[in-house]
Amino acid sequence: MKNKYHIFFTGMLSIAFFMGATVDTKAQDSIAVVSRVNIEHLKAMPDLQLSNTLQGQAAGLIVIPNTGGIGYANSTFYVRGQHSNGTNKAIVIIDGIERPIDDILPEEIESIEVLKDASAKILYGAQATNGVILVRTKRGQAGKRVIRFGAEYGVQPVTRLPEYLDSYNYATLFNEACVNDGLLPLYSDADLQGYRNSTGVNDLLHPNVDYYKEFLRSSSTFRKATLELSGGNARAKYAVTVGYTGSSGLEKVGDRSDLNRVNARGNLDIRITDFLSASADVAARVEKKDWGAKDGGGMFSEISTLRPNEYPFMISAEDIHGHNGIAADETSLLFGASSRKSSNLYSDMLYGGNTSERYVNSQTNLGLNFDLNEFVEGLAAEAYITFDNYSYLRQQLRNDYPTYSIDRYLNAAGDEEIRFTERKKLNLPKKQSIASNSTYRYFGWNARVKYNRSFGLHDMGANAAFRYTAEEATGSSQDLKEGNFTFRANYAYNKRYMLEATLAAMGSNRFQGDNKYFFAHSVGGAWIISNESFLKDMKAVNLLKMKVSYGHLGYAGDTDFFLHRTNWRQGDKEEFKPSTGANTTDLIRLGNPDLKWEYSNELNIGIEGRFLNNRLSGEVNYFRELRKNIIGINSAKYATIGGNFIPSENIGEVLNQGIDACVNWNDKVGEDFTYNLGLNITFTKNKLRKTNELSNIEDYRKSIGQPTSAIFGWQSQGLFGKDVAIAGHPFQSFGNYQVGDIAYADLNNDGMVDNNDQTRIGQSFPKTTLGVDVTLNYKGFGLYILGTATTGVT
């Protein structure tokens, strides 16, 4: 479903086009390695999930799509590959707080930046070491009034579907497989003829069902409308966005899955005095999903695994009445089943009930900003608190209608008869029940004092910041609490040489005692070569900068709570005759009070430039990260006879390195035509250096030295009979095999192919990701083309 056709209507009082030649002076003076995303590109990609639109948009950002039903098919972000053999996901920070990116619309966003090196990530605490997607929402501008309205309607056609066998060909090939296995054919010649002449989905004895044709539409729909209002004056500024998004699924039978979502955001800035201003940001999202008894994922699972002759959709009253005492008339709803499947997909989709999900999310930021330049030149401060609330409710109604499997047997006279066996009974609940519900709350407060001052050729700055967050969720036995204090100092001489150093004290209640805290640091420097006298007069070079950074960062992202504590539980009662017995206590897990933070040592070396009056720009970075102290279970250290209560330890180590690069060319032809061509590429390569693994196993079996996403399996030598003779081949211990089956290699030459012969046969994470984009604008009309590719997944 990758091809999408959209009709886009838009009207606005203020129109702004993105131009690739815009110079970001803040980026020019920065040491941090940051990729920036063009927000206009995201608006051009109509997708329910904003995360999906970021694929191919930035060097260093790897976007892996997830599968799921309507509203669930989002994406996971990775920054510069996989850093660990544990969790590798990057976090998303929206207006200073970690929040889901799919909760907002692209129309709400002012900027998206991908923070990639230690110098950029250290400011965001214990979760940020895997990378940060930094999102800032729009704010009003004094004297600039904007009203924008946009509406879209799109159709997403199915581009390709698998082709499955019909009942006749399925039965024919199944018989052939039986004969190959030395068994008798299952289907008689009469059965084969019956399938060849089948009347279709309701043929009682010989049904023939094309599930994709019967249950799927040829396209789904997408709809969207947004309204943006912003403006203000010197005293007050505002930005308001309201949006509706909706989509309908591919289901042809029964209730079509449907999603309706409303987003609203209001950002307000008020100047109270000459040095004090306040901000209030409020956002809300209400989402409603409705579908039948099966969501899209459940339906696809069924239609891709049911046999074409599994069962008839419906059984007529005439066929079943009187059998086994069954009473039926023309009003009866009776459905087919099989010995393998007691439920009937047609019945489930048409009459099986319904499911509804409700999401209500709210996000609030309240802040104060202090411009203290009047008192101390270059001094400013800010503080804000945040409160987010997420609630979820799922309700469902499940109906069961009678289903019957159909078998044939010979009666006492030797005649063939039909037997109906009830597999499901009639069950019609009167109202929906609550299937699940949850609540998640997030509280945080942030404070920062910053000082920037220039003294002739010298630019100096300092920044002290504190972040505190607390999270609580339904069903969680422990609230997560984390804090991060950072101090950064930077210095630049004559706009040519820049130095930066950052210290951070991180804290997390995932650990115990002194191990609750981790002390991180980063240093970096940059040389703006284009500002040197030997390049200053070269008109073709607008910017040429080299930069390097190194950092030592901590990570506590996916560490379980209470790993420091030994856990027990009440066990079974033991009987000691003649007494009545006694309760026992079982050891669940040994604690490790010395468990420490994971940490990474990161190096980045890069060069960036802009040339030819800023028409050509590009950046290349080499990165190397060594992640240590990765937490895991070191079962190789303990005898298996000891039980399954091994403590967690800091045992893992992963080396990750690679290159990311981007290049852009933007220009104009005449007064009305502008274009931009962009390319970004990310290459990553990692290997596991330490893990839970025995040292005395064969080298080909070791995961150490392999990528963290390595796939292990048996190595094929070809097919028996064609490439390899069965006679003399080592015994394969995992099932019967014959001519035509796959022959696997006996790598340890012990005369048997078993689990000890598994080796690396591929990897699941891409080595290289590529994005190519083309943007064309002519007299207010625009065309955006994006191509993406990945390599290395085998």
Model-identified regions with their sequence ranges:
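Glycine-rich, aromatic-lined ligand/substrate-binding cores of catalytic
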Residues: 377, 763-793
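Short aromatic-centered micro-motifs
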Residues: 92, 737, 747, 774-776
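Extracytoplasmic gating/loop element in the C-terminal half of outer-membrane beta-barrel translocons
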Residues: 347, 732-739, 790-794
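Switch/connector loops and helix/strand junctions flanking conserved nucleotide-binding motifs
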Residues: 123-125, 143-144, 157-160, 289-291, ...
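Conserved small-residue
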Residues: 148-203, 666-764
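Short, small/polar-rich motifs associated with maturation and membrane association
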Residues: 1-265, 277-279, 337, 697
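Outer-membrane beta-barrel proteins
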Residues: 97-139, 160-165, 209-226, 245-281, ...
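Extracellular/periplasmic, surface-exposed regions of secreted and cell-surface proteins
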Residues: 89, 267-276, 282-286, 319-321, ...
